[in-house]
Amino acid sequence: MADMARLRQVEDAWSAMEAAGIASEVVPVTYMNSSADIKAFCGRNGGAVCTSSNAETALEWAYQQGSKVLFLPDQHLGRNTAVLKMGLSLDDCVVWDPHRPNGGLTTEQLRDAKMILWKGHCSVHGRFSEETIPELRAAIPGVQIIVHPECKHEVVLGADLVGSTEFIIQTVEAAPTGSAWAVGTELNLVKRLAADHPDKRIVFLDKTVCYCSTMNRIDLPHFVWAMESLVEGVVVNQIEVDEETEKWAKVALDRMLALPGKTHKD
C-alpha cells in the first residue's frame, strides 16, 4: 500500500491543487501504512498521520484546519470514515488517480470535493467482496460479519460491524460462547482468533486465501536473528532516513499523538 503513493506523485497532485486554487484549503492526512517521505510531506503541509483506530478523530481535526482533506494512500479507509463517521456523502468524495493526467479529475471536481481520496488500497482487504456476505449468512445462521475499514465501501455497508484491528479482536473476544463470526481482515489474525476461541465459530470472509505478503516478510527465523544480534550489540537491517524527512515526519506523527482519545492503536 505504501508504494502506491510516491512522493513525486503526491507533489504533482499538490501542484494541481495549487493550480486549482484550493491547496490552501486542503489538509493532507496519511494512513500510518505510508512511507516516511509521505509522512514528512503531510508534516510540511499542515497535515497529520492516522491509524484505523483514530481516523475519525484525525479527520475531525483536519476539517477544523481546512475545508478539504487529501487522504492517502488508502482510499477505502478514507471513504468509509468520511461517509460513515463524518456524515459526508459519496458525492463529496473524489478519487485522485496518480496515473492519469490531473488525477483524472477536472478543476471543478477538485474545487467541489470535500474529500480527495488517493487511489490506493490494501491488497488483502481490497479482495473482500460484498457478494460473499449473503452467501455466508445463508450458510451460517446468525453469523455476524465484522470487517476492517480498509475494505471496500460496499463490503462495509453489508457488514454488521466495522472497526480497527483492535476493535475486531476485542469484539470477538467478548462475544458469547456459541456465536458465529465471519471476519474480513488479514487471514493470520482470523486463524489466530479461531485458535484462541474454539468455543466460537470464526471463519474468514473471503472465498480464497490471501496472506499479506508484506507482513509475512517478518518470519520467525529472521525475527530471532534480529533479536539475537541485538543481544550481541549488533544492529542489523537498520532503517535510516535523512534528518529533514525525520523532522517533518515526526511533526505529522506528533500532531496525531496530540489528538484526543485513542490515537495510536491500530
Outline where the language-model segments fall:
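Active-site loop-to-helix "anion-binding N-cap" substructures in soluble metabolic enzymes
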Residues: 1-147, 151-183, 190-266
